[in-house]
């Protein structure tokens, strides 16, 4: 069985990727920080219950390390997209969070075969 991590799994695109992978028979780990500005009521009901859900932040090295354990492919959809611009937060989450994930993969020599990154 293939093992995938979807970051930003509570978002529109991330949640659909989770659903598709589960339908295709993948073992899916779903990571999202459940940003209160977007997810006021906590974990959304639309997150596929067959996926292992981890509430965690891309800026938290321990959360990223735990989420990557046993994973073969990463669908990286996590991004801060608030509607009250906070430039420093955008940079920390969207750029430095991605860089931190890549550093963890390299430093721990994780056997990730592929990373699919959403970007703008």
What are these regions (language model features)?
Residues 26-37:
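Conserved glycine-rich Rossmann-like NAD(P)H-binding loop of the short-chain dehydrogenase/reductase
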Residues 4-24:
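N-terminal Rossmann NAD(P)H-binding glycine-rich loop of SDR-like oxidoreductase domains
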Residues 88, 92-99, 113:
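Conserved internal alpha-helix in NAD(P)-dependent oxidoreductase domains
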Residues 100-120:
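Conserved Rossmann-fold NAD(P)-dependent oxidoreductase catalytic core, especially the SDR/UDP-sugar
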């Amino acid at each position: 069985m293939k093992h995938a991590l979807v970051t930003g799994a509570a978002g529109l695109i991330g949640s659909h990727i989770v659903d598709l992978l589960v339908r295709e028979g993948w073992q899916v780990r779903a990571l999202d920080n459940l940003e209160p500005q977007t997810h006021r009521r906590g974990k959304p009901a639309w997150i596929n219950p067959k996926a292992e859900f981890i509430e965690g932040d891309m800026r938290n090295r321990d959360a990223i390390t735990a989420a990557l354990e046993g994973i073969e492919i990463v669908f990286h959809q996590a991004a801060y997209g608030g509607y009250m611009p906070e430039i420093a937060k955008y940079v920390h989450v969207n750029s430095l969070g991605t860089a931190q994930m890549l550093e963890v993969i390299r430093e721990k020599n994780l056997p990730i075969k592929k990373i699919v990154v959403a970007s703008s």
